[in-house]
Amino acid sequence: MADKLIIFDTTLRDGEQSPGASMTKDEKLRIARQLERLKVDVIEAGFAASSNGDFDAVRAIASTIREATICSLARANDRDIARAAQALEGAANARIHIFIATSALHMEKKLRMTPGQVLEQSLQSVRFARNLVADIEFSPEDGYRSDPDFLCRVIEAAIAEGATTINVPDTVGYAIPELYGNFIKMLRERVPNSDKAIWSVHCHNDLGMAVANSLAGVKMGGARQVECTINGLGERAGNCSLEEVVMAVKTRRDYFGLDLGIATQHILAASRMVSQTTGFAVQLNKAIVGANAFAHASGIHQDGVLKARDTYEIMRAQDVGWSANKMVLGKLSGRSAFKQRLQELGVSLDSEAEINLAFARFKELADRKSEIFDEDILALVSDESVSGDNEQYGFVSLFQQSETGKQPHARIVFTVNGQNVHAEAQGNGPVDASLKAIEAHVHSGAEMVLYSVNAISGSTESQGEVTVRLQNSGRIVNGVGADPDIVVASAKAYFSALNKLQNKADRVAAQG
């Protein structure tokens, strides 16, 4: 029987560290449910000690998800570890993930600790955590750039104190596949008790090799856990992409010889959900989940695929969730058809009340555009008004007037803590006028650093999906809004971003 490769998803923790990718508790919970449907083995739900918001999100996910192991990150100190354990109390399967830097550069410049102090803190923290939960992961931050002799000592001590998983991060994406694979192999050979723990890889994509490095760590190094994110989401150039590493191992089972527990047919739904929640669009030619991933433009290729798909396709599109038969809904579609399509798309709403609310919004949209595509439905249920989070600001209605040669004017009605507010302003265009009207009342002081519009489907009556990125006091958030009217979508996106600025407490930055 082949070994199993453990898939550790850190979209909700490391992925969220991408500037602007912050998520609300309910958004995280919705994605966690999709990850459970995808059958990932471990979900790193957050960094419980970093903020009350992260603690609440970890606790909510731990109390809801039953199949996957739920993990919280923690620094190597008693306070962080105790906070993580508290957040994980409701979990069916709990893991605490402890990290401390071990490279000379990080120890000297960041921690201001000696190697001896780092070694002592490592073993003490694992010992403390082991008394709280049985499943402990230990990560020597910047492990790939650490002195091998010192790193072996730290890892040996961590395993001796009860660490069940040893994760070796390439924190800054410096590794090369062959070198990284040999590095993992060397550590496993030199650490005397290496067989007492599962070895894991965590690679960043700064040189574009996160997936290749992770696979080298598995094949050459003997790692049996890969840490990754949906769409490769993560700070800087991102993390190892879950969908790519999973399909590489599945498609080339002849080479890797490993089993996976992943339900790959739910990959596309997970990708779309993360993209629409964070506002980070998936590039068209992205492997596995990009819109062109299974498209053939060359006449020769098209002819070959029509005769036999395996002439130019190494995997089946439907195996990752693409469907050749798209069900198009419309205004005559009933609640049962809508609910069934939600299930097929991997969307789970908590209650009948939420389904009713989503269906009402679906019918409202169907009155405005004749055909409702999958992308429309996903955008609709990703809207924060369905998420259930407490919002300080909410969109009600908008009127805008624009005429050639005259300055556009907008009047908008929105709620502030449940009370209707009316505002109006002029601007350089209808979007500018609408957002100025909002800002004239809320006085957020935030700077807009990104405004982008994407058509959700391909026709002129398509919904527009707007992403607004705001920066204030060093914090960056993305807001996403969708509507057939781009001006309305822009206002919704702006409110979404404002709510995140209000709701998100400052966080402790974590690396890994």
Curated annotation (Swiss-Prot):
Belongs to the alpha-IPM synthase/homocitrate synthase family. LeuA type 1 subfamily. The gene is leuA. Its cofactor is Mn(2+). Keywords: Amino-acid biosynthesis, Branched-chain amino acid biosynthesis, Cytoplasm, Leucine biosynthesis, Manganese, Metal-binding, Transferase. One of its GO terms (biological process) is L-leucine biosynthetic process. Pathway: Amino-acid biosynthesis; L-leucine biosynthesis; L-leucine from 3-methyl-2-oxobutanoate: step 1/4. One of its GO terms (cellular component) is cytosol. Residues 5-268 form the Pyruvate carboxyltransferase domain. Mn(2+) binds at residues 14, 202, 204, 239. It comes from Verminephrobacter eiseniae (strain EF01-2). GO terms for molecular function: 2-isopropylmalate synthase activity; acetyl-CoA C-acetyltransferase activity; manganese ion binding. The keyword Cell wall biogenesis/degradation does not apply. Residues 394-512 are annotated as: Regulatory domain. It is found in: Cytoplasm. Catalyzes the condensation of the acetyl group of acetyl-CoA with 3-methyl-2-oxobutanoate (2-ketoisovalerate) to form 3-carboxy-3-hydroxy-4-methylpentanoate (2-isopropylmalate). It catalyses: 3-methyl-2-oxobutanoate + acetyl-CoA + H2O = (2S)-2-isopropylmalate + CoA + H(+). This is 2-isopropylmalate synthase.
